Amino acid sequence: MGFVKSMLALSLGLSAMGVMPAPACTRVMYKGLDSIVLTARSMDWKENIGTDLWIFPRGMRRNGEAGEHSLEWRSKYGSVIASAYNIATADGMNEKGLVANLLWLAESEFPVRDRMRPGLSISLWAQYVLDNFATVSEAVEALAQEPFALVSSYIPNMPDKFATLHLSLSDPTGDNAIFEYIGGRLVIHHDPSYRVMTNSPVFEQQLALNAYWSEIGGTTMLPGTNRAADRFVRASFYTQAIPVTDDVQLATAAIFSVIRNCSVPLGISTPGQPNISSTIWRVVANQRDRVYFFESVLSPNVFWVDLRDVDFSSDAPVCRLKLTGGQIYAGNAAADFEVSEPFVFEGV
């Protein structure tokens, strides 16, 4: 019993590090049989972030939106993404099955901008990866060279706060990588076993916390609060506990159940803990079959976009699936996208 109490104290101590105004997202990856790989995430935020889904074709010209000497590139791969405020890419999957998830990390400290490197606004961080890489290994090799200076900007409706985020990547082989800026330095965690990410504390400390709870065993006791460290432990346990199957329908249902278990009820508020934010949507990306599932907490059903039904050719238009008006979709919504001008990424 003394051991359990000590582990609980450690969990509460590390969880308390995350008490600050921030969203409480969770990301998990599942690897099943017959090459099934699924990545799920929740988006938790204190208000509606005006998310729409977008189709971006190959060949789009991009600008890093970081002022003078911004990074420029042309997209190599097409992608389906979920926007935030229609000024940033928060989540998405490209046509090669590479998935990018942006989550909050209050401990992020970005370096003073190096003017020798082209700048990249944080609103484009995930999109840059989706545009340019097919695998996690490719992205890790390229980003480790720090080809750009990442520049943060203010959050809509929070004019006194900069965006502090970390980035997770996964691909159809089951590989994973986490990118964080800690103390002004880029830290990359790259290993297929890194299947779970939440918010605070930094990823290295999350791994240590999870190792302690693994000694207890999830069938004995699991931390049950909405804090990031507790959600990390629960997501890790349940991702390992659900069936390893070759039935993609069962696997999808199972990983949805895990991400729902880590979600925060709509409308909940915790006095003194503004970081405990309600879950507003959830995503599951089937990377083997290139299917992007989306679930709004305000919608009666899950719908999906089958990327195999999307035209990503360089002469195809940008298309948008409007969600901000409370629209309801069912089944494969690939045909419901409408041609649209692309949104403008937030710059600095």
Where are these regions (language model features)?
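Proteins synthesized as precursors that undergo proteolytic processing into mature forms
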Residues: 119-152, 248-257
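Positively charged n-region of N-terminal signal peptides that target proteins for export
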Residues: 1-6
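A contiguous strand-loop segment
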Residues: 23-117, 150, 330, 336
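Short, surface-exposed beta-strand-loop junctions and turns on beta-sheet-rich folds
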Residues: 45-47, 106-108, 184-186, 298-302
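Bacterial N-terminal signal peptides
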Residues: 7-18
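A short, polar/proline- and glycine-enriched secondary-structure boundary/capping micro-motif
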Residues: 48-53, 110-114, 188-192, 303-309
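Acidic/His-rich structured neighborhood in mature extracellular/periplasmic domains
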Residues: 96-123, 143-202
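C-terminus-biased signal that marks the final domain/tail of proteins
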Residues: 23-38, 62, 151-153, 157, ...
